[in-house]
Amino acid sequence: MTQNLGISVPMMSSSPLFANAPPEKKGVKNFAIDFLMGGVSAAVSKTAAAPIERVKLLIQNQDEMIKAGRLSEPYKGIGDCFGRTIKDEGFGSLWRGNTANVIRYFPTQALNFAFKDYFKRMFNFKKDKDGYWKWFGGNLASGGAAGASSLFFVYSLDYGRTRLANDAKASKGGGDRQFNGLVDVYRKTLKSDGIAGLYRGFNISCVGIIVYRGLYFGLYDSLKPVLLTGTLQVCSFASFALGWLITNGAGLASYPIDTVRRRMMMTSGEAVKYKSSLDAFQQIPAKEGAKSLFKGAGANILRAIAGAGVLSGYDQLQILFFGKKYGSGGA
């Protein structure tokens, strides 16, 4: 079963921490083909889901945009956000920030491959030999360490994607955009905040990886023996359905972490910033209500469905034309 263990803690948004790493016996040529085809898969699925992804980010971060004077009034929902974005910025604007998101796949997968074996050897516990809790703890530790290590190198791309996606035409200032592209995001952030501006929210993102993995594996191991019994044990659809429900359940439970990290990103270059992720966790619910931590969660679920649907169709095309399915590009 495919495991979506990404940082869009959505974070957690959708990059498997150990996905698409080639088996040790696979040659360099085959790895290169898998790597590139996985990149095509990632580009296809991410580009198809990009409009929903941008709407999710706009709804999630709208309160920071209002504070900065870049949004005149809150969005009333997914449909309202789609309509206003297309009306104010044009249909093509729904893909704003997607290029950075697609580019992020390649270094993420290369880094995952580089780190995965090292951390798996370091926390190499077996469930049947060492017991469930050692295996569970080792899984969290290895996944968290590998995810954080990879994230350190690609976080600025995630930051850039977030700022571009939330760069709606200003409600004040004649409809001007704040950034002209990814390079401009880096240039202005470094000028105003230095390197720290590119990594705002990084610490809570690392926590999010561990929380998501803990919820995912904890729920799966608890529910599988209870729900998948009898004929359901060999039913692939039942296994997929359980995995899908748990993936979305873990993603929804850890969604506030994604909201906090992205809203911290949005304060780079602004006069008022959160002192820390804990300060953000306290301020946001206190001023806006607890539900503000879940803004955009509905769009996030739709994004996952759209991405998975397109990816499934693309996988079938690969089998039809190449006789096999390459890496699924989940990063």
From Swiss-Prot:
Catalytic activity: ADP(in) + ATP(out) = ADP(out) + ATP(in)
Pfam families referenced in this protein's UniProt entry, alphabetically: Mito_carr
Residues covered by region (Important for transport activity): 261-266
UniProt xrefs under Gene3D superfamilies: Mitochondrial carrier domain (1.50.40.10)
Entry-linked PROSITE patterns: SOLCAR
Compartment list: Mitochondrion inner membrane
One cellular-component annotation, GO: mitochondrial inner membrane
Topology class, membrane: Multi-pass membrane protein
GO process terms (BP): mitochondrial ADP transmembrane transport; mitochondrial ATP transmembrane transport
Membership in a protein family: Belongs to the mitochondrial carrier (TC 2.A.29) family.
Domain comment as written in the entry: The transmembrane helices are not perpendicular to the plane of the membrane, but cross the membrane at an angle. At least 2 of the odd-numbered transmembrane helices exhibit a sharp kink, due to the presence of a conserved proline residue.
Protein name: ADP,ATP carrier protein 2, mitochondrial
Taxonomic source organism: Triticum aestivum (Wheat)
Phylogenetic classification of the source organism: Eukaryota, Viridiplantae, Streptophyta, Embryophyta, Tracheophyta
